[in-house]
């Protein structure tokens, strides 16, 4: 996601100068004196020092460059990662400059459930599919707990890579990651197959800058390939879910959230392939955050769902 991008200046101080969308806009255009880092990859922390720098920068930006101390922090993390990987999330805060009072970890499927407004304690069965940038987490919850959760190393960024590979193979043309992402948003979001857009890049044969025209009809099969990965896993989980819970999922429907869940066609194909209605989050990029907000405001009621890190 954009929030996990760090923009850093190389040198003795190595200070962040931008994060998020501002940093990403400079990606693939940076000079040698600038380094772009993606410290969070496939649901886990790939670069601890960069992640700590990102954390400090975010806090300074939100607090008017004042140090925040003595606060309680709630972090949503994938359920299907190791305890060591979960511990790394809490270390971001404990090793940063915020000096936390307490750090709580919440399994992201549970945070999503609360963010969706579900009565988690009485919930008999619900499937939540969280499609992010680098990962997709498919979870089944029942009676306040997670029955099963599977983290796939497949998110919206994979579709960007499929588009880049297709353009390279079919047109002998190289495009950057940001260009591929723009094509994804413009063409796959199209409700018809007659939309087109010009892509700027480099001709592999000539070795010179150029442009090509890509159509929504051309990239539609790529989207289907991406969707099928998610749908196949969702069906597999449903097939191995106890019958009583499966019936509740059938009645309640599948909940779809996450920034990449908005890619056109995913919800419709998921419903067709599973035979289960799909409920799309009103604010898919904010669902887990809304859940964390509930925990922060109702700490006593939420105590059973959070883990206090030491």
Residue ranges, per PLM feature:
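Nucleotide/phosphate-binding catalytic cleft detector across ATP-hydrolyzing
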Residues: 1-128, 141-254, 261-283, 287-288, ...
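Short acidic, Gly/Ser-rich segments with clustered Asp/Glu that frequently serve as metal-coordination loops
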Residues: 133-135
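A structural feature that tracks compact, well-ordered secondary-structure segments
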Residues: 137-139
């Amino acid at each position: 996601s954009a929030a996990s991008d760090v923009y850093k200046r190389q040198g003795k101080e190595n200070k962040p100068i931008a994060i998020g969308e501002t940093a990403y806009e400079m990606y693939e255009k940076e000079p040698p004196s600038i380094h772009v880092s993606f410290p969070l990859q496939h649901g886990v922390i790939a670069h601890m020092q960069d992640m700590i720098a990102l954390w400090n920068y975010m806090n300074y930006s939100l607090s008017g460059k004042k140090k925040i101390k003595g606060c309680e922090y709630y972090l949503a993390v994938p359920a299907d990662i190791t305890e060591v990987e979960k511990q790394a999330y809490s270390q971001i805060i404990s090793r940063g400059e915020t000096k936390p009072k307490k750090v709580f970890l919440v399994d992201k499927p549970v945070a999503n459930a609360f963010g969706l407004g579900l009565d988690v304690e009485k919930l008999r069965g619900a499937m939540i599919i969280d499609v992010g940038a680098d990962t997709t987490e498919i979870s089944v919850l029942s009676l306040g707990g997670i029955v099963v959760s599977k983290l796939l190393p497949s998110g919206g960024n994979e579709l960007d890579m499929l588009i880049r590979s297709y353009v390279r193979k079919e047109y002998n043309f190289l495009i950057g990651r940001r260009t591929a992402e723009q094509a994804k948003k413009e063409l796959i979001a199209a409700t018809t197959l007659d939309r087109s857009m010009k892509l700027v890049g480099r001709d592999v044969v000539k070795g010179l800058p150029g442009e090509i025209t890509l159509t929504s009809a051309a990239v539609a099969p790529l989207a289907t390939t991406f969707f099928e990965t998610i749908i196949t896993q969702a069906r597999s989980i449903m097939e191995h879910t106890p019958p009583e819970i499966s019936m509740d999922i059938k009645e309640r429907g599948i909940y779809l959230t996450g920034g990449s869940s908005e890619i056109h066609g995913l919800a419709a194909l998921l419903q067709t392939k599973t035979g289960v209605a799909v409920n799309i989050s009103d604010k898919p990029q904010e669902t887990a955050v809304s859940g964390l907000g509930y925990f922060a405001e109702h700490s006593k009621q939420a105590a059973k769902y959070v883990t206090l890190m030491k």
